[in-house]
Design a protein with these regions (language model features):
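Gram-negative bacterial Sec-dependent N-terminal signal peptides
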Residues: 1-22
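A residue-level marker of the well-folded mature domains of exported/periplasmic proteins
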Residues: 22-378
Length: 378
């Protein structure tokens, strides 16, 4: 009996020690490694440090929705960056899966990769909450989980993003200022929203509408859902014009090439517009700005996946990292566009133009991205 009790005690102690050894990252004092690349979100951002592992590492990208060009380019960018000389020797295995808009399916895929012994999982969250269980499992297994783009409403994991609220405010500021130059302090605004139910769409919309609330008015606001997709956005904007008539300005979270094409097809006057960084949109700005299409282009780069992958590897190497990493907003206005520099007439309209991050030494070229497939890597 004593031997049995002793064995049980030893097993319980070993289990407890294993749980303690892999209890997630430690909160440490800053600064973190390479602050020019991995900039903390604010002065209040905490720093996390995982136990160093020996590479090369097993890394997975778990995407959700894959039905628009941004997500497709993101997947291609992840594959291209995994083959980049700066990363290739640090990766032993690399997998990419897209699970659709079903949150349980995404959570299940993340859990599967944790159970398969992957070292890091980079993900675009379908929902900003509901990840508590997989976060605990990742911590228990000493796995680095890195949400980016559509991030989580938690500070328990390292995350990478641009400031979506600031982006929405920049959209709103542009529209308000351009209308003021035309002598308008009120009017009808069309907001083209993104994919419903995630933090990016929510925060950008909050930013846009906060600026409208703070400036002039009254503003008549019409909102349509474009899913950040050119085809969808073109259809819903065409429908909005047919139902509501002319708008004084447009703030589009994405699918901006389709938004402008809907205006052109409907014979809608060229009005101030705020939109994303699609190559086609920038082509149209360059072509029609003299006709009144005064636009701003702010990019949420698909290349964020590369920064998230780079951050994951840095964390696995034992470096202290900001809990929330801030990537600056890449902004270009209609009068700053230059062919071959920040848009390309010889690349497809659905190519997203911002894929270079000089502070991180990351520059994924257009040809290397476009040569990849968007298919899962299993």
């Amino acid at each position: 009996m004593r031997m049995r009790l002793g064995l049980a005690t030893l097993l319980a102690t070993a289990s407890l020690m294993a749980q303690v050894a892999y209890a997630g990252p430690e909160i440490v004092a800053g600064p973190g490694v390479d602050p020019a690349c991995f900039a903390p979100w604010s002065a209040d951002t905490k720093f996390l440090q995982w136990p160093a592992k020996e590479g090369p590492f097993k890394i997975a990208v778990v995407n959700g929705f894959v039905g628009n060009t941004w997500r497709i380019q993101m997947i291609k960018t992840a594959k291209a960056f995994a083959e980049d000389p700066s990363m290739k020797d640090k990766i032993a295995e690399f997998k990419v899966v897209s699970t659709g808009t079903d949150a349980p399916a995404q959570l299940g895929a993340i859990e599967d990769f944790i159970n398969q012994g992957y070292d890091a999982i980079v993900t675009i969250a379908v929902s900003p909450d509901g990840f508590d269980r997989v976060i605990r499992l990742a911590d228990k297994s000493n796995v680095v989980l890195v949400p980016f783009d559509n991030v989580l409403d938690t500070d328990a994991v390292m995350q990478v993003n641009e400031d979506q609220l600031a982006m929405g405010r920049a959209y709103g500021d542009w529209v308000v200022k351009q209308l003021a130059e035309l002598g308008k302090t009120s009017g009808k605004i069309l907001e083209v929203r993104g994919l419903a139910g995630n933090s990016v769409d929510r925060d950008r919309s909050i930013g846009i509408n906060a600026v409208l609330d703070e400036n002039g008015g009254p503003w008549e606001r019409v909102s349509v859902v474009g899913n950040w997709d050119d085809g969808t956005a073109q259809k819903v904007v065409a429908d909005a014009i047919a139902v509501h008539g002319q708008f004084d300005a447009i703030a589009a979270q994405g699918g901006t090439t389709g938004v402008v094409q809907a205006m052109l097809d409907a014979g809608h006057p060229m009005v101030p517009i705020a939109g994303e960084a699609e190559n086609g949109y920038r082509k149209l700005l360059a072509k029609h700005s003299a006709e009144g299409l005064k636009g701003i282009s702010i990019g949420q780069s698909p290349g964020l996946v590369a920064i998230a992958m780079k951050a994951a590897v840095s964390a696995l190497e034992g470096n202290p990292m900001p809990q929330l990493i801030s990537v600056p907003l890449p902004i270009a206005t209609y009068d700053q566009l230059e062919d071959g520099v920040n848009y390309w007439t010889d690349l497809p309209d659905n190519f997203f133009t911002v894929n270079e991050f000089p502070p991180c030494g990351v520059n994924i070229t257009g040809p290397s991205i476009m040569s990849q497939s968007e298919a899962d890597v299993n």
